Every structure is written in C-alpha cells, then in structure tokens.
Swiss-Prot record:
It catalyses: a plastoquinone + NADH + (n+1) H(+)(in) = a plastoquinol + NAD(+) + n H(+)(out); a plastoquinone + NADPH + (n+1) H(+)(in) = a plastoquinol + NADP(+) + n H(+)(out). This is NAD(P)H-quinone oxidoreductase subunit I, chloroplastic. NCBIfam families: ndhI, NuoI, PRK05888.1-3. It comes from Lepidium virginicum. Residues 55-84, 95-124 form the 4Fe-4S ferredoxin-type domain.
Amino acid sequence: MLPMITGFMNYGQQTLRAARYIGQGFMITLSHTNRLPVTIQYPYEKLITSERFRGRIHFEFDKCIACEVCVRVCPIDLPVVDWKLETNIRKKRLLNYSIDFGICIFCGNCVEYCPTNCLSMTEEYEFSTYDRHELNYNQIALGRLPMSVIDDYTIRTILNSPQTKKG
C-alpha cells in the first residue's frame, strides 16, 4: 500500500511540475504580445542597414592606379586587375578590374587598404541570380563607365553633326 501512495505522490508532483513549466512558457508567450515585430516583410520593406554595413563594392575606374594592393590584402586573392605598363610615361594603365561576388567574403580589406579610395562599400545586398557567372562584376558593373565622355559614340555623333558645327 505504501509504494502505491508514494507512486501517486510522485505522479502528482510530476503533474504539478509539468503544469508549472507549461505556465512559464505561456507567460513568456504572453509577454511577447506587446512587443514590436522583429521580422520585416522583405520584398515590400527594405532592411535598414547600419553605417558600417559591408555590401557590394563600388569601384571608381578613374581613381585606380593599378597598384594591386587590393589583391595582396584580400584573403582569397579575389580582385582581378589587368593593367598595361605605358613605357613612355612609366606608369601602369588599368585595362580591366573585376570582382566575383560569388566568392567574395565581404571582409572589407580591399576598401580599407586602397591608397586612392577608389573602392567603397555600398548598402546593396541583393545578389540573387539564377547563374553564378552573373555575380562576376567587371568595372562597368562595379561603378562608372571606364571611358571618357569624348570617346563615347553618342557624344562623338553629336559633336560631328552639322547642326552643332553651325553654332
């Protein structure tokens, strides 16, 4: 008879303990009802990024001196810098600059150590594509067009038109 009574007492204690734990969980749930939502409705609302957010890298072709510091400080040697040595002026001329954001770890070393500040981090974080090769950005996709305004075909056409030569 005594083991039966202790069994009922243990069962009762376990029941009370379970009810207390359920009540604690319910109280935590109720305490969250007055709080603001943590999630955002992504396509319709944009995430407000902090000042130091490391998003897509912006590149300014005109400022780059092809020193390749960005390649040396990158942990994965990611930026591809193609340049040509101009022998008459003994300077490097930048031909092509590209970064593959499918491989980039967004550490920011290239931006931090660039001597001419031609690289900067933007707030852009949407990189969704169906093909991973679309994540390889060249200098045109990274920033401004790498051609001077006078070399542009549209500008040359306008400058060579007879109407502009009259005025």
